[in-house]
């Protein structure tokens, strides 16, 4: 996706205007809504990427058996929720968006982080094991560690 800041701002303003009228962009213009979501994904990737050092440290400690699965789940979840809150504020802040420039290195990082977070529920539901989560964490860690060394 080619990031177009002016278009992103235009879509966000339109979405906010519709929301103030009790309407939503999805119902009014599904294509524009989809385009706005793509811009929001770019922001999500970047926000999570800015916290990559913290995520990598928690992941490395888990992979190196410094912390156990329960400790990993707690530390990762707290970091995830903090980062998600930051994203929720950023995604509607026009001043932040005006300064925003996505990084190609962050591509799909948030997707991996979101998947790890969802895996905790899968373990609770006995859909996967702690070892399977660890394998996925290792895969994500290795994929992105070339961009950041802990």
Regions found by a protein language model. Give the residues of each.
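Acidic, Ser/Pro/Thr-rich low-complexity regulatory regions
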Residues: 1-150
